[in-house]
């Protein structure tokens, strides 16, 4: 009964139900088993990791396990004298889903810190799918498995505008599919998640507020007897007033659960508990390949793809694949051109909110990440991590072709294109292609003329922030890069690289026409004009043209009477 049917997708082995329940089913006297013992807890990150088939399988298995534990008469692990048919399960007494059974059976429901909406909805479903061991309402004879639902129903008889429930015999999986795919919940300001949607509002009832019928499209619906609850600041509709209160918390920040370490606010206590793991030393998931530990199972799974090379999320537009779903979602905005996040300072827009937040630091000058070795600070955390490898010498990313290693994975990806010749970034204006997205972005500014970085001293503008930084050293006189051969200093590293060729004699740029080589690419470009006859620099006074800008400047001195 606990096994997974042939052909059905498998849950990750760490998340499968424990074997204690199977033992208890074979020999009930061997020990009491509770639903907590076999239930599986998912954090929000872990839940997002599952695909739709696995989510449906999870609900199937949990519902089946719930029915079995209920039939054994050992629901929540709290000892009392009631018979199974008299046991009450309060809507507020929802057990914890755990991967570890430690302490789960000794805690009563009132001390439970994690209250998951998923289980509550599973219990609602169990009530409506024919479980006949619940409580009986003497007023009208209707039976309920959950005492909270009994209390809500009793309000009908005292005219308290109760929440009502109407169901048919549609399967739980059908309900999942309908409400995940049709997405009947709308909100302009709040990002809805799947677990909040497990209230199972009928599509028609959401739109009209009318009582849903026994359509096979909806397994269970809960809503107010008169109309849905709405809040003036948000268009989202709710079937339960407690969900509305939670939604109001998101917008007003009232009654939130706040982390004492960092001040982050959560709308649910269970979310706060999950968040607090970030601050704790608890890292229960260890990678067998490299020994790295992780706080969340989802982070562990994603990390393993570094070793396996698995990239399960493919872009339907270009076929490019990714190891994480959010990376795919971010990538798809490249095709759609969607850039919804705009900077209020300069108007620049971004496809991701995190990119906008990082960009804002250009204007504010904030650099919150500081190196403990040299005191250098950075605006982004990953920049600090990369910088620290300068001190440690760590170069973990190695090329399989030539053995060259790199401190950044992105550098390795770019390097591999030297071997493959791949140039995936093509300009739609001129057709020129590039190996790196940064080079492509820089090139596009040639066509747009965009120069967003302005010098505060002289007003000169630049297309790149790095160019502005180098330029500002003209005003400050800073020359932080020094030659180890002759102690000559330079304002930027690129100038040092060019200078070092004076000492090494390296001349990497060779003319394909005559074989002459040069130490700088600009010198090769000027030399090629000898073969092509191109003279792009023209004198405005006499119309004479030149192949080199410096020669034009010298020529112009003839007109102004200045001696060259």
From Swiss-Prot:
Record localization: Nucleus
Region (Disordered): 85-108
Cellular component GO terms, alphabetical: nucleus
Zn-finger (C2H2-type) residues: 131-157, 257-279, 285-307, 313-335, 341-363, 369-391, 397-419, 425-447, 453-475, 481-503, 509-531, 537-559
Single GO MF descriptor: zinc ion binding
InterPro entries listed in its UniProt record: C2H2-ZF_domain, KRAB, KRAB_dom_sf, Znf_C2H2_sf, Znf_C2H2_type
GO-annotated biological processes: regulation of transcription by RNA polymerase II
Residue span(s) of domain KRAB: 33-106
Location (main, coarse): nucleus
Pfam families on file: KRAB, zf-C2H2, zf-C2H2_6
Family, as annotated: Belongs to the krueppel C2H2-type zinc-finger protein family.
Protein name per UniProt: Zinc finger protein 211
Species this chain originates from: Homo sapiens (Human)
């Amino acid at each position: 009964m606990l096994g997974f049917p042939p052909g059905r997708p498998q849950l990750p082995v760490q998340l499968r139900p424990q074997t204690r329940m199977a033992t208890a089913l074979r020999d009930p006297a061997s020990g009491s088993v509770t639903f907590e013992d076999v239930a599986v807890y998912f954090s929000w990150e872990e839940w997002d990791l599952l695909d739709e088939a696995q989510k449906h399988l999870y609900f199937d298995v949990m519902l089946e396990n719930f029915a079995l534990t209920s039939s054994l008469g050992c629901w929540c692990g709290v000892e009392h004298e009631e018979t199974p048919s008299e046991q009450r399960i309060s809507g507020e007494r929802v057990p914890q889903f755990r991967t570890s059974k430690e302490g789960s059976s000794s805690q009563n429901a009132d001390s439970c810190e994690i209250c998951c909406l998923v289980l509550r909805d599973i219990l609602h479903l169990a009530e409506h799918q024919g479980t006949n061991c619940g409580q009986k309402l003497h007023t009208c004879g209707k039976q309920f498995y959950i005492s909270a639902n009994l209390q809500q129903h009793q309000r009908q008889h005292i005219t308290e505008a109760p929440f009502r429930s109407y169901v048919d015999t549609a399967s739980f999986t059908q309900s999942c599919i309908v409400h995940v795919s049709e997405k009947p919940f709308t909100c302009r300001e709040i990002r809805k998640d799947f677990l909040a949607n497990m209230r199972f509002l009928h599509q028609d009832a959401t739109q009209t507020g009318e009582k849903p019928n026994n359509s096979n499209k909806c397994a269970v619906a809960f809503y107010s007897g008169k109309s849905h609850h709405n809040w003036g600041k948000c268009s989202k509709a709710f079937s339960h007033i407690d969900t509305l209160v939670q939604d109001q918390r998101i917008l007003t920040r009232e009654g939130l659960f706040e982390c004492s370490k960092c001040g982050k606010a959560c709308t649910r206590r269970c979310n706060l508990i999950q968040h607090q793991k970030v601050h704790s030393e608890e890292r229960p998931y260890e990678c067998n390949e490299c020994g790295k530990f992780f706080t969340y199972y989802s982070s562990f799974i994603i990390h393993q793809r570094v070793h396996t090379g698995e990239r399960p999320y493919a872009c339907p537009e270009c076929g490019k694949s990714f190891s994480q779903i959010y990376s795919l979602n971010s990538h798809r905005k490249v095709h759609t051109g969607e850039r919804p996040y705009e900077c209020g300072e300069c108007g620049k827009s971004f496809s991701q909110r995190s990119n906008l937040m990082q960009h804002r630091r250009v204007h504010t000058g904030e650099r919150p990440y500081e190196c403990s070795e040299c005191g250098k600070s950075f605006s982004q955390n990953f920049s600090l991590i990369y910088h620290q490898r300068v001190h440690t010498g760590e170069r973990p990313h190695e090329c399989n072709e030539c053995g060259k290693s790199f401190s950044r994975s992105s550098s390795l990806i770019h390097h591999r294109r030297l071997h493959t010749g791949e140039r995936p970034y093509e300009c739609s204006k001129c057709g020129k292609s590039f190996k790196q997205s940064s080079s492509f972005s820089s090139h596009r500014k040639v066509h747009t003329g965009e120069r967003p970085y302005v010098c505060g001293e002289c007003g000169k503008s630049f297309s790149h922030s790095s160019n502005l930084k180098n330029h500002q050293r003209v005003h400050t006189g800073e020359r932080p890069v020094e030659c180890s051969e002759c102690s000559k200093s330079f304002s930027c590293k690129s100038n040092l690289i060019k200078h070092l060729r004076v000492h090494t004699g390296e001349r990497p740029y060779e003319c394909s026409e005559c074989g002459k080589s040069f130490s700088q690419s600009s010198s090769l470009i000027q030399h090629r004009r000898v073969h092509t006859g191109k003279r792009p620099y023209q004198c405005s006074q006499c119309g004479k043209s030149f192949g080199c800008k410096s020669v034009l400047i010298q020529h112009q001195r003839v007109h102004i009477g200045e001696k060259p």
